[in-house]
Every structure is written in C-alpha cells, then in structure tokens.
C-alpha cells in the first residue's frame, strides 16, 4: 500500500493522478488565504487613491498659501508653513510608492500562485505526473 501523501502507481509503473495530502493542503491554504489577500489588495488600492487625493490637496493648499503670501501688503511669513506642507507631501508620496511596490509584489505573487495552481490542476486532470515531480 502506498504511503499517505504519495501518488499511486499503476500496474505499468506510471504514476496515477491523485491529489496528495500536500496538494490538498496547499489548495486549501490558497482558498483560505485568497479572500484575505483580495481584501488587503482592495484596501491598499483605496489607500493609494486617498493618498493621491491628499497629495493634490496639499499641492493646492501650498499654491494658495504662496499666492496669499505674494498678495499680502503686510509682511506675513508663510514660507515655513509652505515648507512643512511640501515636506508632508513628500512623505505622502514616499508612503504611496512603498504601498505601490508592495501591491505590485502581492499582485505578482498572486499571479504566480494562480499559475502554479493551474499547472497542478492540469497535472491532476491529465492523470500523469512528470518524472521527478516533487508531487510524486
């Protein structure tokens, strides 16, 4: 009798398709994590959109402060506040870039997992594992 977690072998010595314990566990884990990954991805997308909006608002406010500063007859020094706004904008852009990179890595990982899952399903459906397959 074949050990648990290994593929069965036909009388001709060729491996017969059958989900191994490892494959079943991997598939279950993927299905379990998929909603969380999708939710995380949608939240990251929403945060990125709000950061773009925040960056635009900071730009508008900085422009308006510069305009007010130029139009004032009284010497009102708004430059430190404009600099603080621009520094905040720079930080928002930095965080947005970090989020964008993380989201792209997550997207590539998700694509890679989906591709591997499809490959394994195709192997299971075909009924034969290639020689030297780690799923044997």
Swiss-Prot record:
Predominant subcellular localization, coarse grouping: membrane
Q: Can the keyword Nucleotide-binding be found in this entry's annotation?
A: no
Tissue expression profile of the protein: Strongly expressed in heart, brain, testis, kidney and liver; low expression in spleen, lung and skeletal muscle. In the testis, expressed in the seminiferous tubules.
- Residues with PTM N-acetylalanine: 2
Q: Which UniProt keywords apply?
A: Acetylation, Coiled coil, Cytoplasm, Cytoplasmic vesicle, Exocytosis, Golgi apparatus, Lysosome, Membrane, Phosphoprotein, Synapse
Q: Name one process (GO BP) from the record.
A: establishment of vesicle localization
Give a GO cellular-component term: acrosomal vesicle
Phosphothreonine: residues carrying this PTM: 14
Specify whether Nucleotide-binding is a keyword of the entry: no
Pfam families, sorted: Snapin_Pallidin
Domain of life (superkingdom): Eukaryota
UniProt topology in membrane: Peripheral membrane protein
The signal peptide annotation in the UniProt record is none
Q: Provide the positions where the record notes the PTM Phosphotyrosine.
A: 129
Disulphide bridges, residue numbers:
none
Regarding how it is modified after translation, the entry says: Phosphorylated by PKD, phosphorylation controls SNAPIN protein stability. Phosphorylated by CSNK1D/CK1.
Extract the coiled-coil ranges from the record. 37-126
Q: Where in the cell is the protein located? A: Membrane; Cytoplasm, Cytosol; Cytoplasm, Perinuclear region; Golgi apparatus membrane
Residue intervals passing through the bilayer: none
Question: Phosphoserine is carried by which residues?
Answer: 10, 50, 126, 133
Which GO MF terms does the UniProt record name?
A: SNARE binding
Fetch the InterPro entries from UniProt.
Snapin, Snapin/Pallidin/Snn1
**Partners and quaternary state?**
Component of the biogenesis of lysosome-related organelles complex 1 (BLOC-1) composed of BLOC1S1, BLOC1S2, BLOC1S3, BLOC1S4, BLOC1S5, BLOC1S6, DTNBP1/BLOC1S7 and SNAPIN/BLOC1S8. Octamer composed of one copy each BLOC1S1, BLOC1S2, BLOC1S3, BLOC1S4, BLOC1S5, BLOC1S6, DTNBP1/BLOC1S7 and SNAPIN/BLOC1S8. The BLOC-1 complex associates with the AP-3 protein complex and membrane protein cargos. Component of the BLOC-one-related complex (BORC) which is composed of BLOC1S1, BLOC1S2, BORCS5, BORCS6, BORCS7, BORCS8, KXD1 and SNAPIN. Associates with the SNARE complex.
**Functional note:** Component of the BLOC-1 complex, a complex that is required for normal biogenesis of lysosome-related organelles (LRO), such as platelet dense granules and melanosomes. In concert with the AP-3 complex, the BLOC-1 complex is required to target membrane protein cargos into vesicles assembled at cell bodies for delivery into neurites and nerve terminals. The BLOC-1 complex, in association with SNARE proteins, is also proposed to be involved in neurite extension. Plays a role in intracellular vesicle trafficking and synaptic vesicle recycling.
Protein name as it appears in the record? SNARE-associated protein Snapin
The beginning of the lineage is: Eukaryota, Metazoa, Chordata, Craniata, Vertebrata
